[in-house]
Amino acid sequence: MIKGWSDVMVGPPWDDSSVSKTQPGRVILAGTPIGDRRSASPALIETLRDARIIAAEDTRRLRDLLRRLDVETSARVVSYFEGNETARTSELIDCLLDGDDVVVATDAGMPSVSDPGYRLVIAAIEHGIVVTSVPGPTAVTTALAISGLPTNRFCFEGFLPRKPGERRRRLGELAEEPRTVVLYEAPHRLADLLDDAAEILGVDRRAAVCRELTKTHEEVRRGGLGELAEWAREHARGEITVVLEGAQGTIVSIDEAAEMVAQLTADGLKRSKAVAQVARATGVDRHELYDVAQEALATDKEES
């Protein structure tokens, strides 16, 4: 068991009764607005105002948020982003052990959820340091709630790999996922992601593309992956969250399933694993699919 899981009492960040000068400080993960500043809670405003140290993903954006929230603070603001997260975590642990609370704030949403913060959380737990939060909105649950897709069971995939082959392999793994899938994507990669998803998951698989959530130009586009891929080529702008319908076990033709296997193996997945994934996702017989995929491979070799 990691040190600290069982012996740390966690209290709300605005209650100082459990902290004394001889105790370590606390890591406070501060959920910031994902767009509309009115989403900021009174607890967030108070925490930022009273903070002594704020570890910010982008110090300029943090100061802009403070200005928009009309918050004055004497906190020492330090940068804490992917490029310096490992080194800065050690420095912040020293501050925590000296008794200072450290507030972590990312550009938008909840720290450590596809954003900096996770390394500090683990390091704090290992040192027996309290980790708590000021809850705030996240694009994950906001997009899920308004997507129109099932919300009772879902999984979050963060950002898929940037490299096409790795991205396609990950989509192949998700082909059999029965839960609704939520993921993030950069606007300049959205069309490629949806093209790959349409090919691997099916052009008619339902999805929702949510952009600029809670902002003035918020938009939710719903439809099949094929039509959304076409739309994305001209309209992919802003912060993007994609929600994908889970696998329904829809049966496709054996030839279509064999083509899916061929694509997954071309992307580097072993044929046996590709066959198993496609069979579970489509409902075709695994043994029959393996034979057809093998025959198709032999035919391709003869023709080449």
Model segments located where?
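Glycine-rich, flexible N-terminal cofactor/catalytic loop recognition
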Residues: 2-81
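Class I SAM-dependent methyltransferase SAM-binding "motif I" and its flanking Rossmann-like core
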Residues: 119-177
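Conserved helicase motor
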Residues: 79-86, 160-163
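A contiguous loop/helix-start segment that scaffolds small-molecule binding in enzyme catalytic cores
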Residues: 2-20, 24, 101, 180, ...
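Short active-site oxyanion
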Residues: 48-54, 128-132, 180-181
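Generic beta-sheet signal
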Residues: 26-30, 98-106, 154, 179-183, ...
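Glycine/small-residue-rich loop that forms an oxyanion/phosphate-binding "nest" at active or ligand-binding sites
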Residues: 89-138, 142
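Alpha-helix capping/helix-boundary segments
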Residues: 60-62, 109-110, 139, 189
